[in-house]
Amino acid sequence: MGDKTKVQVSKLKPGRYIIIDDEPCRIVNITVSSPGKHGSAKARIEAVGIFDGKVRSIVKPTSAEVDVPIIDKKTAQVIAITPDTVQIMDMETYETFEVPIDTGVADEIRDQLKEGINVEYWETLGRIKIMRIKGEGE
């Protein structure tokens, strides 16, 4: 999709998402410090990449605007599993996608994937990640 929006740093909270170095990240911690009598407050944002799991941190004035990804959360069915990719089909549009196992599948569910099950996947900035296995009726 490639969709993103701008949000003021002072509005960000832990658990929300931000784009750092063109990587969508989940915010883990925000520390705001006032530098002194003159100057604006600065926010130190620590975040973990959704796709690569790397910890990133940035320091920005609280009045600055940062990019925030728009994440589409959708349901798909696993069609096929190869040694390095998973093929999934969207349950609404019936589009099929090839998702690399190393960067596109959450570590916790990698061993539980099998053909025919429904999964929740996130699509953002033109990339896809399978986040969790959905139960019956979800």
Swiss-Prot record:
Main localization (coarse): cytoplasm
Modified residues (Hypusine): K37
GO biological process terms on file: positive regulation of translational elongation; positive regulation of translational termination
Entries under Pfam families matching the protein: eIF-5a (PF01287), IF5A-like_N (PF21485)
GO CC entries: cytoplasm
Location of this chain's protein in the cell: Cytoplasm
GO molecular function annotation: ribosome binding; RNA binding; translation elongation factor activity; translation initiation factor activity
Superkingdom, taxonomy of origin: Archaea
SUPFAM superfamilies xref list: Nucleic acid-binding proteins, Translation proteins SH3-like domain
Keywords: Cytoplasm, Hypusine, Initiation factor, Protein biosynthesis
Xref: Gene3D superfamilies: 2.30.30.30, Nucleic acid-binding proteins
Function summary: Functions by promoting the formation of the first peptide bond.
Database matches in NCBIfam families: eIF_5A, PRK03999.1
Family under the similarity heading: Belongs to the eIF-5A family.
Official protein name in the record: Translation initiation factor 5A
